[in-house]
């Protein structure tokens, strides 16, 4: 009878990553009952950074979910363990949040193990999800917009009394403003480490302002740049009137 490892397929990876992935799958086979294992992330895509980890998605039939973070042969790995029903719920939730992380892992990852038709069925659903726009409710988008504006206003208020807090809040609001560019366009949010490059592809001048903001320590300059970024993205620099829909 074939073992789980006998039924695995392996991607073409650099030796250290290949060894780590095989060790991780061995750990999974020994401790879980997988019907599917999918490896994804920058290591699999061939463009890892020095601290990149293996992203490994495990599909099992047990009605439990778990996350394991563990080193294998010196390489960090994040292991996500879920039953099919939970995965489908993640698809819907992440479509609404604008960050389809689960769908992206399943659709673009390498199938190391597939012992059940549900693996390919989930991958097909994931691919379909990625062709569809986010389902973020307009009210949540407006709340995020207001949060960015209010945070900038707080940063400006604190520039004399508490400069450190002003620096902190200004940094927070810039990320929210840049996210609004994608929410307003009804497209998925990029990963945080890809955010500035994704902005540059849409608006090079806006990206240059963001880079200048993060590269300067001068609070006055930072707040001036934050104001320009606010004007370009959320269109407001502080409190504004709006009304949410009534809910029970």
Protein language model annotation of sequence segments:
Residues 25, 66, 178:
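Generic structural marker for isolated residues within well-ordered, non-membrane alpha-helices
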Residues 25, 35-36, 45, 89, ...:
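A positional/architectural concept
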Residues 26, 111, 214-218:
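Amphipathic alpha-helical interaction elements
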Residues 37-82:
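Catalytic metal-binding acidic patch
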Residues 1-35:
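Helical scaffold of the NTase/Pol beta-like nucleotidyltransferase catalytic core
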Residues 3-4, 130-248:
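Conserved nucleotidyltransferase catalytic core and NTase-mimicking acidic/glycine-rich helix/loop elements
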Residues 2-13, 68-160:
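Conserved NTP/Mg2+-binding pocket subregion across the NTase superfamily
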